[in-house]
């Protein structure tokens, strides 16, 4: 229908129809007969003002609640009502609008209607009205007993205005549908008008077509057009109030804007209702807009063209957008995770491990086989270096302290230089500066007759060095550990082995470190203070002692905690109780000497050398035999044969017969060297071979001697597994313990169980620190044997400390200071 059609034509069309909309006689009704004006009978008369005796405390009480008993148009009759819309069109002269006598706000003592608007708005958004403001037709406001469709002052069906959508600005809140603006917003809009542009005047004329006329009451509960287009039709309601006012007597209820969708009213200066905030997450798509915490949905602004196309039925994109918005509203909001390193890292690969200058090249993992072989050769060169410069620059020198221990125990002859059995607490150790020390190629060499090196692995303090502990997270750690674990290896039952763990403070402030063990096992003990302070960029050493009480495996964790920084580092600590003890069985032709690592044997026929080796320890052990001549040259394999082999495995409490046959042509090939021996004093010692050669000059003696390197078979099996892991030969002090089979060894070795320590480069160093040596001197004449015995007794009687030996006791180096004095009586030839 054309809205500009003459009203008489409308009256002719619907003359026979009318609506009985007289007010109900109710004491609580808002309808007032005295002030009601029938505009159809007398259109020119002014509205009769309300009596002066009409007060706020009397019958009319603006309680901000809608009346209950006023009749409204029911849902089932709205089709009939639509046909009678034109019969209720009322026209009022402009004089009535200009007459301020009907301004109900002045009657109630209000200066303006703003306070009533604010009261109504606050009541509408109060905590008690937890209504669904997104779609009011399905919300709590329409279904409550006070505001249901049967007892509501509001229209039974809400209208959707056909007014043009205001311009959407860039700074407008993101996509709101119920943006309520008060007089403050209107004032703000007027201030934003350009100076040269006139503000259009808004005239409240009831003769204006309803499609363009502003209706505050209907706009308050405007319904979304997403369900159907029937809401665009005009609806009738209960009788109008005088003067076009609302139930509070004011004209300026909050206006309705279509610029945005789903936004809470900006009039709200107080907090948003909790239920409203929980249903509507914060806008995440328009963070730079004017949307504050009141933004309820994360949608983009819908343009004017899209809205017009939807209203005209051309496009349904808006319907789809509204449906998606409704689905997103029910979707739970993902909470941000502010934890550091929320994704745990796995173990670093071999190529990603952190590097360090003081990290031992022996413990570094090389990716390619070519680099492995090159690195191995470099290690051997550094180990065999003969100068003090090489010693200072070598990686292995970092494992020794600036001071070394020199044992002065005179009566402790039960231990060999590498033997841990027979350790006594009566040993006296003295700290001396390590000044002009030289490195040696051989780990043990052969000890002096006049001095017994009593520094064994079980009786010494070990300084553990090596690579950094693996970093499991990207966050910097306040402490830096030079090893990832403490491996004590095999320790004799009842003996004590002490190791030092270096801990460095990497921060710029002091750290209070608490070191403790996570188990109550008495075998392990932290010797230092449990709590200590570490200065910035400084390091301390934590001593841990291991004393096994029975045969078995022990493992626990050493925890280093920095409570102020909530940091805890665990260092695995493990060790075995019980060792093997291999030694030659004394016979008539084989006798021990005052040095526990030296034995003398008389053999009339050098073609066959036979002796027995026995294992009196608690575990199976291995023995590797090597034959040297009097000039400390190793006899080639083509001139010597071993029966059963040069490598054997001996079980505990078991003996094995060893036969060595030397080809007589060996002397013809290399010449007789016994007449070339000298008694010159030692001025510089650089290698184990030269040191042994010096002792051969000092101690007149043997034609050959046999070096027996022995240890626990379990630690050699770990070395074999390390060799299979890296696929390269593991040489220990120039000796090969793994490339050839040993007699009675296991044919196949398997990786250790999960509860056991994993195979790592530390096993190489652990093996080098744990195996021991002893020597059997072979004499072809009784005179040589007697001279050897006399030299041994004289050296022990006159010069017990003739040679001062220093060792790190855990790593690869043996140092000899240039203080050796050669007794004059040792020269026999």
Curated annotation (Swiss-Prot):
InterPro entries reported in the protein's UniProt record: Cep192_Spd-2-like_dom, Ig-like_fold, Spd-2/CEP192
The UniProt regions of compositional bias labelled Basic and acidic residues, in chain numbering, are 54-82, 183-216
Region Disordered: start-end pairs: 1-29, 41-104, 183-294, 326-471
Alphabetical list of Gene3D superfamilies matching this protein: Immunoglobulins
Write out the biased-composition intervals (Low complexity): 361-370, 384-408
Q: What highest taxon heads this organism's lineage?
A: Eukaryota
A molecular-function term among this protein's GO annotations: protein kinase binding
Q: Which GO terms describe its biological process?
A: centriole replication; centrosome-templated microtubule nucleation; embryo development ending in birth or egg hatching; protein localization to centrosome; vulval development
Name the predominant localization: cytoplasm
Q: Which GO terms describe its cellular component?
A: centriole; cytoplasm; pericentriolar material
The parts of the chain that form a coiled coil are: 314-332
Give the subcellular location: Cytoplasm, Cytoskeleton, Microtubule organizing center, Centrosome, Centriole
> Which keywords, in A-to-Z order, does the entry hold?
Cell cycle, Coiled coil, Cytoplasm, Cytoskeleton, Developmental protein
Q: What does this protein do?
A: Required both for centrosome duplication and maturation. Required for pericentriolar material (PCM) recruitment.
Protein name listed in UniProt: Spindle-defective protein 2
Gene source species? Caenorhabditis briggsae
